[in-house]
Structures are given as structure tokens and as C-alpha cells.
Design a protein with these regions (language model features):
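Short, hydrophobic-biased segments on the C-terminal half of alpha helices
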Residues: 28, 61-62
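Charged, amphipathic alpha-helical coiled-coil/dimerization segments
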Residues: 79-99, 103
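Beta-hairpin "wing" of winged helix-turn-helix
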Residues: 67-82
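Key DNA-contact positions within bacterial/archaeal DNA-binding proteins
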Residues: 55
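N-terminal helix-turn-helix DNA-binding core of bacterial DNA-binding proteins
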Residues: 19-52, 71
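Alpha-helical residues within the helix-turn-helix
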Residues: 48, 65-66
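C-terminal regulatory/oligomerization modules of transcriptional regulators
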Residues: 3-12, 105-153
């Protein structure tokens, strides 16, 4: 059984992305492994495997499905899945769907008034980092990232 190594997310993702976004990324990568080729995986299985709250994860997966990042099927054998088209989408789509496109333009210290005219102490140092992360996440497909995530358990 594949479960996503939390070290993959340890520094960069926890610093930049909400817990909701982290759950969504982990779920999408799980689906890339278990729900590819249209094979449906239920919320309960995903939630138990990733050790995340089921009802909360269900809402995130529905949001991803409404935005065509993953597929879904209703009914007794329903669940969530990924087609080859879903797998070729860039990982940034998941992040923008859950945390919004402004995640890379917001202040790393969370200061609302931080901008080029009124920078926080980390504004310019974090700019290159954020731009680099944005490029990586735009360039990497869900399939590429899923293949690089180590299997444990």
C-alpha cells in the first residue's frame, strides 16, 4: 500500500500551503497511484490511508472534482479517480484550487500590508524562493510528482 512520505512536504509545503492544501495534494498523489485509469477510490480509503479527517477530505475532493482536477463517480461503486488527462495537469492546479492563486504573492510572514513599496523583513529574500517554487509546481505534472514520492508501509 502506498502512503505519502511526510518528509516530502516537511519544510516547503508546510511553510507555504494551508493544511487543506496539503491534504488535497496528498490525496491527489494517492489517487495518481491508486485511482489511475479511471479506477474509483472511496473517500474512506483515502482518508484512512492518509490519516486525514474523512468529511473534511470529502469536501476537498469535491472541490477538486468540480474544478476538473480529478474525476468522480456517484453510486455504490463510486469514488474519485484520475484519467490520463488529469495526471498530465500541473501540480499548481491543485494548489490554486484550494489555496487560491495569491498563495505565491502573499507575505511569508502573513503581514497584509507587505508589498514592494512596504516590504516586510523577508520580502525580497523570499521572492526568489517563491518564484522558484511556482516554476517547479507549474512545470511538474501530477504524474511526475506521484512517481517520485517514495512508497512506505
Amino acid at each position: 500500500m502506498s502512503i505519502l512520505c511526510t518528509d516530502f512536504f516537511a519544510f516547503d509545503f508546510e511553510l507555504m500551503f494551508s493544511k487543506s492544501c496539503q491534504y488535497a495534494i496528498r490525496a491527489v498523489l494517492y489517487l495518481a497511484d491508486k485511482g489511475k485509469d479511471g479506477q474509483c477510490v472511496g473517500v474512506k480509503e483515502i482518508a484512512e490511508t492518509l490519516e486525514v479527517p474523512g468529511p473534511f477530505l470529502a469536501k476537498l475532493l469535491q472541490q477538486l472534482s468540480r474544478n476538473h482536477i480529478i474525476g468522480s463517480t456517484k453510486g455504490p461503486h463510486g469514488g474519485f479517480c484520475m484519467t490520463s488527462a488529469h495526471l498530465q495537469a500541473s501540480l499548481i492546479r491543485v494548489i490554486e484550487c484550494i489555496d487560491g492563486p495569491e498563495v505565491f504573492s502573499s507575505c511569508v510572514l502573513g503581514l497584509p500590508a507587505c508589498n514592494a513599496a512596504n516590504p516586510c523583513p523577508l520580502h525580497y529574500q523570499s521572492l526568489a524562493y517563491k518564484q522558484g517554487m511556482l516554476k517547479i509546481l507549474k512545470d511538474k505534472t501530477i504524474a511526475e510528482v506521484a512517481q517520485q514520492v517514495p512508497e512506505i508501509v
